[in-house]
From Swiss-Prot:
Impact upon substituting L164A: No significant change in APOE-mediated activation of LILRB4
Cellular-component GO terms for this entry: cell surface; cytoplasmic side of plasma membrane; extracellular exosome; plasma membrane
Organism: Homo sapiens
Modified residues (Phosphoserine): S319
Mutagenesis / variant outcome for changing R95A: No significant change in APOE-mediated activation of LILRB4
Inducers of expression: Induced on monocyte-derived macrophages by S.typhimurium infection. Induced on monocytes and dendritic cells upon contact with CD8(+)CD28(-) alloantigen-specific T suppressor (Ts) cells.
Effect of P149A: No significant change in APOE-mediated activation of LILRB4
Protein name: Leukocyte immunoglobulin-like receptor subfamily B member 4
Gene Ontology biological process terms, A to Z: adaptive immune response; cytokine-mediated signaling pathway; Fc receptor mediated inhibitory signaling pathway; immune response-regulating signaling pathway; interleukin-10-mediated signaling pathway; negative regulation of activated T cell proliferation; negative regulation of canonical NF-kappaB signal transduction; negative regulation of chemokine production
Underlying gene: LILRB4
Effect annotated for changing P35A: Significant reduction in APOE-mediated activation of LILRB4
Extracellular side: 22-259
Length: 448
């Protein structure tokens, strides 16, 4: 018995503080309308009330109407309720508040929501004095006029945080009107405006909206902080609201824009510098190559032939078309003993004394056999001194060869020389009685 009593006492002590804390005032809900609080006659509107997850019921009250005006169960996840108005009429215009009920009681009332209906009266006219195009820092006045005896006017700026501005009308003229001065004008004042007219005893019923007026602000981007607009010639009601927020003009977007422009400019300059550097390097390399080529051409004597190969033996070069066009070979004749199977018939131009004489050599060859030695031939005629290299660098030989279709190939070689040294050699003493042999020409033949 005693342990049971002790357990119940501890449970009561532990639940006591919690119950005491929850019994306090609940936070007030949030109330708003979609698509907005200013609704044209005949259009639908939805009122939302949002509380906490512990809410069990939501209630909507309308001023000057029996309470509660409507009750709704919460929607999942049970933190808000919806109140629908299918068609807006004069009966729905007014001021609303909402509550929600939790297990511990009802919450505090929400902030008021003013539901305004337009289209109850004829539309007024809206104009700008002196002009809808105003320079930043100057003053401008928006004038709303009505032909009907209206005493309340409202000015609305589209997409503004606080769209409504209530002002009383000015009496003493045939046309009732209200002035909305703006001084000094800044960039935040620019935009599209409309005005409404109504009676003071029911300012939730408005006229049709006026034609839109576009206010254009030109000049410097940095403007002073706008001051709240008030009518000088009218008395403001307690429901007056500022036309625009009175905070400082935000410049974060402009600063970000300048930062982007500066970054793009820096990147462009870097890319241009890199391109100029590459072009300069390419121009310098081309200039060095041109100078090196000119120096090489200057060191080589004009008309000098390519240096002849030092190897004077028989050189054979094979190609894939060798079986069809015959063998291509280079033969250097340096002694008086031609290779086996080669018969050379030389014919010299009649102008032997011409330094640029042309000599044709008919070469009849067969497969050379390197293991057999040919008999020595007599040495006579003119020959080229091969020991003097510097004197023979002026010699150039162009050869043209044509493959013959006969079983034995016949090749003609054209010898074009710039400087020829002719030397006549006397026959050996053992051949004085023999008939003189034809002169021989020793040259390097390159047959392609």
């Amino acid at each position: 018995m005693i342990p049971t009593f002790t357990a119940l006492l501890c449970l009561g002590l532990s639940l006591g503080p919690r119950t005491h804390m929850q019994a306090g005032p609940l936070p007030k809900p949030t109330l708003w309308a979609e698509p907005g609080s200013v609704i044209s006659w005949g259009n639908s509107v939805t009122i939302w009330c949002q509380g906490t997850l512990e809410a069990r019921e939501y209630r909507l009250d309308k001023e000057e109407s029996p309470a509660p005006w409507d009750r709704q169960n919460p929607l999942e996840p049970k933190n808000k309720a919806r109140f629908s108005i299918p068609s807006m009429t004069e009966d729905y215009a007014g001021r609303y508040r909402c509550y929600y009920r939790s297990p511990v009681g009802w919450s505090q009332p929400s902030d008021p929501l003013e539901l305004v209906m337009t289209g109850a009266y004829s539309k007024p006219t809206l104009s700008a004095l002196p002009s809808p195009l105003v320079t930043s820092g100057k003053s401008v006045t928006l004038l709303c006029q009505s032909r009907s005896p209206m005493d309340t006017f409202l000015l609305i700026k589209e997409r503004a945080a606080h769209p409504l501005l209530h002002l009383r009308s000015e009496h003493g003229a045939q046309q009732h009107q209200a002035e909305f001065p703006m001084s000094p004008v800044t960039s935040v004042h620019g935009g599209t405006y409309r005005c409404f007219s109504s009676h003071g005893f029911s300012h939730y019923l408005l006229s049709h909206p006026s034609d839109p007026l576009e206010l254009i602000v030109s000049g410097s981007l940095e403007d002073p902080r706008p001051s709240p607009t008030r009518s000088v010639s009218t008395a403001a009601g307690p429901e007056d609201q500022p036309l625009m927020p009175t905070g400082s003009v935000p410049h974060s977007g402009l600063r970000r824009h300048w930062e982007v422009l500066i970054g793009v400019l820096v990147v462009s300059i870097l890319l241009l510098s890199l391109l100029l550097f590459l072009l300069l390097q390419h121009w310098r390399q081309g200039k060095h190559r041109t100078l090196a080529q000119r120096q090489a051409d200057f060191q080589r004597p004009p008309g000098a032939a390519e240096p002849e190969p030092k190897d004077g033996g028989l050189q054979r070069r094979s190609s894939p078309a060798a079986d069809v066009q015959g063998e291509n070979f280079c033969a250097a004749v340096k002694n008086t003993q031609p290779e086996d199977g080669v018969e050379m018939d030389t014919r010299q131009s009649p102008h032997d004394e011409d330094p640029q004489a042309v000599t044709y050599a008919k070469v009849k060859h067969s497969r050379p056999r390197r293991e057999m030695a040919s008999p020595p031939s007599p040495l006579s005629g003119e020959f080229l001194d091969t020991k003097d290299r510097q004197a023979e660098e002026d010699r150039q030989m162009d050869t043209e060869a044509a493959a013959s279709e006969a079983p034995q190939d016949v090749t003609y070689a054209q010898l074009h020389s710039f400087t020829l040294r002719q030397k006549a050699t006397e026959p050996p003493p053992s051949q004085e009685g023999a008939s003189p042999a034809e002169p021989s020409v020793y040259a390097t033949l390159a047959i392609h």
